[in-house]
């Protein structure tokens, strides 16, 4: 029998391999990835500085260690050029050499790529993105060379705010730019976003909102950058970091005939429309929902591992709050499903506030907890929210 093949060595790929091995220690398992296959937890990148973690301390294991630990054949630095669903084969390329890899079941754990803005100027190619440990290593190396520690971050979403807090906490001057009028504008009601912003500003982070970057130019013999904004303002930075969001990596799947929308479309069994092809992680749009967070990956991996072991199992999405790593403004969010209309009910405390999202049936559908006092209600509130994808027997 041909092996089960996982494309991707991120958290989704490795978590699935680990869960599968708990259930089936023998079936041949192959992982294919374009990078070096080092296993690490990507969420740790946005607070590694304040945790005194150097890039070399972040990995959990290299390809050799993971291959031994999980009884897994790893084809690193290998590109999947095409999927042939009819023959159950992949066309691979490494160092200019093409090979064919057969599969019995194929799992797409290909993640998401950073969104890149079209920005003018001779400094635009120097803008950092951090979507991998390799990216992060380059960012930290550049950061260590800089004298004035002025960092401009493009994007006031989750990752932008987490990096801003981490950098500010370690002595950097941080300015965050976003087209939205408030940070975390897609996740938070306006009044909570305002309070969140105020807390971060009190810690020393600067926000320039309702505008965007038009140009990044090298100045001072290439040592610094002039960041020109659409509102006419110019900022001087030692480093520019882009954190404006991620786009699920759907091209490989799409070319193979897999149905895609924002992500790779799957049902609650994580099956795509093509036989024996599955998707998990940041690339997977499960029952019409994209959830690029850690807990959904864990739920997906456990369910799919069982299915691949012969026990058909639907993924179960309970209410899964997201803890935002911004100690200057402790925040937990349970996002409201996109198709649900809600009214927000707010309770204020000395150190923050709590907001509940109530739908037209008087059911709690989400919440936001800002500050330590509100944060204590996380477990109680989570139990009141209906499952996003109910458990199936």
Swiss-Prot record:
Its EC number is 1.18.1.1. It is an enzyme of class 1 (oxidoreductase). The keyword Flavoprotein applies. Pathway: Hydrocarbon metabolism; alkane degradation. The keyword Hydrolase does not apply. One of its GO terms (biological process) is alkane catabolic process. Induction: Constitutively expressed. SUPFAM superfamilies: FAD/NAD(P)-binding domain. GO terms for cellular component: cytoplasm. This is Rubredoxin-NAD(+) reductase. The lineage of its organism: Bacteria, Pseudomonadati, Pseudomonadota, Gammaproteobacteria, Moraxellales.
């Amino acid at each position: 029998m041909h092996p089960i093949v996982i494309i991707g060595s991120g958290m989704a790929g490795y978590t699935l391999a680990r869960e599968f091995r708990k259930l089936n220690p023998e079936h041949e398992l192959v992982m294919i990835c374009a990078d070096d296959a080092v296993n690490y937890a990507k969420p740790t990148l946005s607070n590694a500085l304040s945790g005194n973690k150097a890039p070399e301390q972040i990995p959990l294991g290299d390809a050799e260690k993971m291959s031994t630990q999980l009884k897994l054949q790893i084809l690193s630095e290998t590109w999947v050029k095409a999927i042939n669903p009819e023959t159950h084969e992949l066309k691979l390329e490494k160092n200019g050499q093409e090979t064919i890899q057969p599969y019995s079941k194929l799992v797409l754990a290909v993640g998401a790529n950073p969104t890149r803005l079209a920005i003018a100027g001779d400094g635009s190619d120097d803008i950092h993105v951090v979507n991998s440990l390799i990216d992060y290593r380059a960012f930290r190396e550049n950061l260590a060379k800089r004298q004035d520690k002025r960092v401009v971050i493009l994007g006031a979403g989750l990752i932008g705010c987490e990096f801003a807090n981490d950098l500010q906490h370690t002595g950097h001057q941080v300015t965050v730019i976003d087209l939205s009028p408030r940070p975390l504008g897609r996740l938070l009601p306006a009044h909570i976003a305002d309070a969140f912003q105020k807390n971060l500003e009190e810690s020393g982070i600067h926000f320039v909102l309702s505008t965007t970057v038009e140009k990044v130019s090298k100045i001072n013999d290439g040592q610094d950058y002039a960041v020109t904004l659409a509102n006419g303002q110019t900022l001087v930075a030692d480093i520019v970091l882009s954190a404006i969001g991620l786009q699920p990596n759907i091209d490989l799947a799409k070319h193979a005939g897999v149905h895609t929308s924002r992500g790779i479309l799957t049902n609650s069994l994580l099956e795509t429309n093509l036989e024996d092809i599955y998707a998990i992680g940041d690339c997977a749009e499960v029952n019409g929902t994209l959830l690029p967070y850690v807990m959904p990956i864990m739920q997906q991996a456990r369910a799919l591992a069982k299915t691949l072991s012969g026990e058909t199992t639907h993924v179960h999405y309970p209410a899964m709050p997201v803890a935002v790593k911004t100690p200057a403004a402790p925040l937990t969010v349970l996002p409201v499903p996109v198709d649900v209309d809600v009214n927000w009910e707010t309770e204020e405390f000395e150190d923050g506030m709590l907001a509940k999202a109530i739908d037209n049936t008087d059911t709690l559908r989400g919440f936001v907890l800002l500050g330590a006092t509100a944060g204590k209600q996380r477990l109680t509130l989570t139990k009141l929210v209906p499952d996003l994808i109910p458990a199936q027997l």
